[in-house]
């Protein structure tokens, strides 16, 4: 996924509603633990732990999360142990990204972490697999403190199965020494510039469905119906979807466009000065800001003009990071308490300050001045009202591969305006195919 991988979750998206971790050491001192969480694919297994010496009942918890959050989560786990001295907590951690959580947990639920982070498009899949423990501790408080859309993304059939803590979508970074605020209002404005030293005016990961869907959403197309829950509906092949296809074919053919820019190319392009603007998210904010310095800027995605002359605002696919509790944990009350701690207001604020993560906590997200003080989070907030929350229905599993294939065919030139309708029909047919 990112990934196939928000004005009041970040303020208006979260109220309007528009798809990682571990710890070691202890709060004081302790002994090492050798248990480890498993990981595979793009995840890297690691282990480590520590035992609090505060006393009382001994409780061992395993926590999974992405590599980039490990140190932060260790700190939060240690603070949890210190805040609960009536028990002795030991923690083991494994490196498993949010994107890989469902795959790794479902390999063997009984052997998976007690607490793990996952992306919101996996909620229904994990629930249907019997992998998530229903939230029964402080549920009303969690619902009240977080945005409506994030709670919806963590729920199935009205029951809460996770603890949301990050709102996520993509937006546009740009080098303000190369482009003005007026230039970046539209793709046409960006692409019209001739900029010394720049080989790519605008970069986008065309064959990544998470990003690609933004063009279709901008034109008014729907993935799985109006609310994203109808597995029989996808209209990317209608008249407006066809105009999106036309636009992408022309855009990819422009030598000033970077058609297949993943995170590494975006970061290196800004670092060496050959890139003027690119679509990405908060996870790259630190490195891009370091590269651009005083010329660092970010804003909502640009508008683009369809072949009928209509100008539309590019949309985006939004999701949430959620902390879940294993349905087979031996310590459900402690695991729920830890998951709630890792996602509480204070720790969401810490993630905002240290990782540029946009909070789902309503009070934090409503602090417009603070949110806008972070350029990347401010841009995410601007884009939020144009975002569509990523669905978690099982049918979504069928979306990523056809989206990738469609993008690759445009890049390769095998999808042309002559056969575009056939390609779009095949795209939609594959998305709506019966799940195996």
Regions found by a protein language model. Give the residues of each.
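Short, well-ordered beta-strand elements
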Residues: 56-68, 88-94, 115, 200-202
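Extracytoplasmic "Venus flytrap"/periplasmic binding protein-like
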Residues: 79, 83-146, 177, 182, ...
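A structural signal for short loop-to-beta-strand junctions that line the ligand-binding cleft
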Residues: 106-107, 111-114, 142-176, 200-205, ...
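Hinge/lid segment of periplasmic solute-binding proteins
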Residues: 119-171, 182, 297-301, 372-373
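Extracytoplasmic/periplasmic solute-binding protein
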Residues: 161-165, 170, 188-234, 275
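Glycine-centered hinge/linker elements that transmit conformational signals in sensory
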Residues: 230-260
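Extracytoplasmic/periplasmic substrate-recognition and gating elements
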Residues: 290-354
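Conserved C-terminal helix/tail region of periplasmic/extracytoplasmic solute-binding proteins
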Residues: 368, 381-436
């Amino acid at each position: 996924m990112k990934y196939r991988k928000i004005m009041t979750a970040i303020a208006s998206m979260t109220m309007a509603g528009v798809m990682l971790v571990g710890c070691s050491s202890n709060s004081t001192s302790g002994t090492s633990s050798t248990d480890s969480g498993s990981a595979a694919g793009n995840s890297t297994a690691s282990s480590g732990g520590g035992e609090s010496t505060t006393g009382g009942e001994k409780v061992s918890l395993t926590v999974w999360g992405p590599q980039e959050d490990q140190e932060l989560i260790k700190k939060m786990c240690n603070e949890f142990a210190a805040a609960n001295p009536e028990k002795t907590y030991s923690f083991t951690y494994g490196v498993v990204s949010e994107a890989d959580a469902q795959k790794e947990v479902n390999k063997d639920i009984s052997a998976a972490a007690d607490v793990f982070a996952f992306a919101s498009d996996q909620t229904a899949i994990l629930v249907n697999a019997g992998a998530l423990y229903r939230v029964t501790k402080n549920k009303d408080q969690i619902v009240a403190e977080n945005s409506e859309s994030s709670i919806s993304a963590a729920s199935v059939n009205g029951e809460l199965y996770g603890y949301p803590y990050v709102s996520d979508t993509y937006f546009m970074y740009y080098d303000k020494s190369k482009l003005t605020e007026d230039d970046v209002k539209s793709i046409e404005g960006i692409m019209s510039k001739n900029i010394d030293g720049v080989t790519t005016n605008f970069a986008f990961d065309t064959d990544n469905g998470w990003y690609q869907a933004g063009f279709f959403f901008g034109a008014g197309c729907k993935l799985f119906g109006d609310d994203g829950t109808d597995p029989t509906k996808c209209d990317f092949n209608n008249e407006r979807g066809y105009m999106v296809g036309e636009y992408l074919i022309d855009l990819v053919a422009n030598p000033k466009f970077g058609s297949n820019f993943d995170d590494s190319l975006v970061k290196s392009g800004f670092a060496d000065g050959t890139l003027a603007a690119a679509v990405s998210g908060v996870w790259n904010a630190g490195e891009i800001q370091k590269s651009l310095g005083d010329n660092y800027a970010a804003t909502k995605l640009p508008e683009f003009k369809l072949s009928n002359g209509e100008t539309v605002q590019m949309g985006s696919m939004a999701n949430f990071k959620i902390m879940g509790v294993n349905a087979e944990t031996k310590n459900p009350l402690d695991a729920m308490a830890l998951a709630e701690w890792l996602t509480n207001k204070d720790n969401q604020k810490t993630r905002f300050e240290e990782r540029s993560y946009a909070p789902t906590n309503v009070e934090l997200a409503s602090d417009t001045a603070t949110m806008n003080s972070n350029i990347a989070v401010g841009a995410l907030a601007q884009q939020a009202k144009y975002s569509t929350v990523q669905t978690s229905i099982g049918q979504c599993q069928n979306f990523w591969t056809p989206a990738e294939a469609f993008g690759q065919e445009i890049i390769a030139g095998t999808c042309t305006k002559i056969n575009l309708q056939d390609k779009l029909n095949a795209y939609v047919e594959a998305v709506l195919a019966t799940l195996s």
